[in-house]
């Protein structure tokens, strides 16, 4: 699902070579004339979007953005406390996700597998030229400090199991400072 808008000029330039279901011109014309979609949409996606928007409205957009920033700052502090390096440089860091370079000797698939299988924590890998070199932690949406505490507790245990020296509880303590 995607929310989008296009200019009148872009609408005029829409060509007739299209797929049946993703016929953007047909969608727009149907919405203008009948206020509905041309085909049966994925109703659960609309309901999920509605719920997500209601949650943002309830929390307040500014509060949501501030919370995401606070979670991002706590994540970055926890990463540094473990002696790990951020990717990219912190000046370019996002408040939606944090990428972390693996320490030398820690292998991506093994690290993420242990996190998932032993601790039920999933972190994302990377793509392209940094695939296998970094992992990513998301901290937006309904992510909470409780989620971060559990994630970093699992990261500490996994790094320790893989032979990387970690001061037990250090990253969790760093996160607690932001709560």
Regions found by a protein language model. Give the residues of each.
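A short beta-turn/loop motif at secondary-structure boundaries
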Residues: 90-92, 128-131
């Amino acid at each position: 699902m995607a929310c989008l808008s296009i200019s009148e000029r872009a609408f005029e330039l829409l060509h007739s070579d299209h797929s049946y279901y993703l016929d953007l011109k047909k969608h727009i014309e149907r919405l203008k004339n009948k206020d509905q979609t041309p085909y049966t949409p994925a109703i659960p996606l609309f309901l999920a979007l509605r719920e997500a928007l209601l949650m943002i409205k309830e929390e307040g957009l500014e509060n949501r953005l501030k919370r995401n920033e606070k979670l991002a700052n706590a994540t970055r502090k926890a990463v540094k406390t473990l002696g790990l390096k951020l990717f990219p440089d912190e000046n370019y860091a996002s408040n939606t996700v944090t990428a972390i370079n693996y320490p030398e000797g820690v292998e991506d698939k093994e690290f993420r597998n242990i996190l998932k299988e032993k601790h039920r924590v999933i972190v994302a890998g990377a793509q392209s030229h940094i695939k296998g070199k970094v992992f990513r932690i998301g901290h937006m949406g309904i992510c909470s400090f409780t989620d971060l505490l559990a994630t970093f507790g699992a990261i500490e245990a996994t790094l320790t199991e893989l032979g990387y020296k970690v001061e037990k509880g250090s990253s969790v303590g760093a996160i607690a400072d932001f709560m």
